[in-house]
Structures are given as structure tokens and as C-alpha cells.
Amino acid sequence: MKKINHWINGKNVAGADYFHTTNPATGEVLAEVASGGEAEINQAAAAAKEAFPKWANLPMKERARLMRRLGDLIDQNVPEIAAMETADTGLPIHQTKNVLIPRASHNFEFFAEVCQQMNGKTYPVDDKMLNYTLVQPVGVCALVSPWNVPFMTATWKVAPCLALGNTAVLKMSELSPLTADRLGELALEAGIPAGVLNVVQGYGATAGDALVRHHDVRAVSFTGGTATGRNIMKNAGLKKYSMELGGKSPVLIFEDADIERALDAALFTIFSINGERCTAGSRIFIQQSIYPEFVKRFAERANRLRVGDPTDPNTQIGALISQQHWEKVSGYIRLGIEEGATLLAGGADKPSDLPAHLKAGNFLRPTVLADVDNRMRVAQEEIFGPVACLLPFKDEAEGLRLANDVEYGLASYIWTQDVSKVLRLARGIEAGMVFVNTQNVRDLRQPFGGVKASGTGREGGEYSFEVFAEMKNVCISMGDHPIPKWGV
């Protein structure tokens, strides 16, 4: 059986203990994975600390060259990495192969260029004084990445972190360890020096906790659940943090919207990536005048989505990450019905028409709950699965109030042709990102992140460097400015 070890200081390091990672679509054991803890984290942090001075002082152009080389290697291995990601996560192969893994390659290409444009500023005070700033790496960084789009998210952290001159310890979710192992291997193949990128496998409560608490770690970039993020900030001490946490993103569809395009986008935003995405438009608010027709058409199309083998290019909904997560999502569907929502598509049970080799898989049909009240738990709590909650609203004021009436504030989506309404809502909605008349279309130059319980800090473009860089001010006197004379 395949064994997944740690990558520490350029070496493939065996673990003292191992656990199994399984294919969520079939139940098949894919590999034995090293279960790291404090000892492995100490080794990795020490390696990163030792590698930091030389890496930080490497000419920026040389670091950029190595980043581009790593991006090229990923690009050359997209089919292999995509197949690995699909097997480990249950994500449909058409998404991993055509979108998510190519994005990972682009992350290195993009940040190789952006890091070379990071410059300090000068502040001439007068003819006697000059201030200027230096942009410098922070040192050893903890990168903690989630299971839902593991390879892309990991590279989104690794690329800006390393490009700026930091070194890193990457800890992936124990539910999706395979592609992180491949990333560690490709980094060495690209020529990135030993110790610059270390990959420690293991559980959050052991390896993850030891990593974020480590005294040599200067910055933590975490993507995951809100409860875990709060615990990290509470327990890890005085460090720099970037926290991309949970979401319960609203979609506001007004009666003057392009309904066909709004339907397309609303379905995609909640059901792509199996609904396991932080920016999922899981609360879909529809203006009362168009509510009945929109709900009918939305449910009809949800019922036609193809659920099945993630390796089939025609599959749109694959398997949820684990049996435990399946039970959580299924439980929320039952809860929504108990709370009074109307089930129009899907349901809490596995599809009955799965082929024999998928019977043990964690499959759920895309589920539509209509007539949801915004105070129901299914409308307030992050489900993180293919479950859409449909709610009516009367007018702009009520739509905005309902959209904001939740603890999260990551993404938001607005559908209207009224430009004045767009400008008012974009200012008033409590979210880190607002998408108008579109699904979530990302540009790497834009800031990605949320407000309220959805996190702190931003990733993307130069904003990624906020957690990975220190701004140092230098003040220089030209020689004869006045200095107070004390003790004369």
C-alpha cells in the first residue's frame, strides 16, 4: 500500500504512526499517511528557521525563477494531480482537471511576478530628514490548508509566502493529504532548497495545534472552520494571522434581474465543488413577485444535476469528503424539514441508483429547501454541502436586512439591473466580497476574505503579503537637524 510521509528539510521522513486516507466515492483505502505531532513539527520548524536567512537573501529574481519552475512542473502534471485530488476528495474530475489544479500552477506564476513589484515607499520630511520603508519577510510561517480544494488552496498560501522570502511548514487536513505530498516532492524537483517548504501530515489536534503554537512561527495563514480559527487565535499567541473561515453567503435576486442568468449562477454557486465551498451561495433570497416561478425552475434544474462517479467527466456532483461530513449535511437536511422548510429536490438519503462500486460512497443529491425562514438553523449555520435554502423577500430594505442577519460575512451575490440599487447594496451588505450579476469569478489581483465570523485578513494579489511581510521604517538624518540638548 502507498505510504505518505512527511517532507522535512528536503527528506521524506517516515512517521511513528500512520492512519488511512480513503476514497470518499468508493470507501477504498488509498494510502497510509504519517500522523505527525509535536516532534515532527519541531523538526520542520527548525529546518524552516535554519533555511530562512539564505532563502530570504536570495535575489528576488532567483526566487521568482524557482516559483515559475514549480508552476511549470504542476502544469506538466495536471492529469496526475487532478486524478489524485479527485480520488482523495470526491470532487468531480472535470473540476479538478480543468479548473482547480491549473489554478494552482497559475498561483506560482502570478506571485513570481507580484513579489518583484513589492517596493517600499519614501517619505521626504524636509531637506534634513528622509524616511523610507522596507518590505521584509516575517520568517517561519504556518500554512494550514483545508480539505475541500486542498491543492489549489495550499498553493495559494505557499506561493506568496515563499516568493516574498519566507519559509514554511504546510499542514494539510488529514482528510486530503495526497496532493500536499506531491507538492512537497515537486518543490524539491523545482530546485527549492531543503527546509524552505516542509510538509507535515497529521491531525489538527496534534500536528496543527503544535504548529500554530510553535514559538518560532511568526505568522499563521489558516483556511477552515470558524470555531477552529477562533481557537487558533486564542491559543497561538502573538503572531500575524490571516484567517479565511466559514460562510453563509447570500444571493439577492430582484424582480428586474436577468432570471435565466441568475438561475445559472445560483445553481453553480451552491452546487459546484459538491457544495463544499466557503463562498457557496447557500441562502438564496428571491423577490416575492418572482419567487414561485424561480423556485419551481431552480428545483427542476437541481433534480437534473448528475450525481455519481467523480472520475466520470460528465459527473457534476461527486462524493462528500467523509462519512462523518455526510452525516452532518444529511442531518441538516432533516433538520430543515423539521423546522418547516419545504423539500423540493434531493433529500437526506443516498441516491438509490448508484452502481455497486459506489454504494459505500458519501453521496447526496443536490437538495433544495424552499420557504425557509432566515432564523432557521439551516439558514444561519454553515452546512458546507449541496443544500440550497430559498427564501422570499419583499423589497430592497428587507433583502439587505435578511442578507446581513447572519454571523458570517464572506461573499455575497446581487442580481439586479438597477445601478443605483447595486451601489447602495454593495456599500450596505456585510461581506468581504460582492459579486454583481455574476457567480464567484476570481481575479488573483483582488482581495479575498471576509468580515464578522468569516475571518480576518485578505489573500490575493498584494493583499496576500499583509500576513507574510513586515513593513520596516527607516529614518535618516541629513546631518544638522535640531536635537534637544538634555543634561547640559
Model-identified regions with their sequence ranges:
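Short, well-ordered beta-strand elements within core beta-sheets of diverse protein domains
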Residues: V29-G36, A51-N57, L143, V251-F254, ...
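Hydrophobic face of amphipathic alpha-helices that form TPR/SEL1-like repeat modules
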Residues: M1-A25
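ALDH superfamily catalytic-core signature
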Residues: A227-D373, V436, I483-P484
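Conserved C-terminal structural/oligomerization subdomain of aldehyde/semialdehyde dehydrogenase
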Residues: T26-E32, V217, L252, R306, ...
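Long amphipathic alpha-helix in the N-terminal Rossmann-like dinucleotide-binding domain
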Residues: A46, R68-P79, I93-M118
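Rossmann-like NAD(P) dinucleotide-binding subdomain of oxidoreductase/dehydrogenase enzymes
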Residues: G120-R261, F393
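A short hydrophobic/small-residue beta-strand
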Residues: T167-V169, L343, M433
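N-terminal alpha-helical segment of soluble enzymes
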Residues: P24-T89, S289
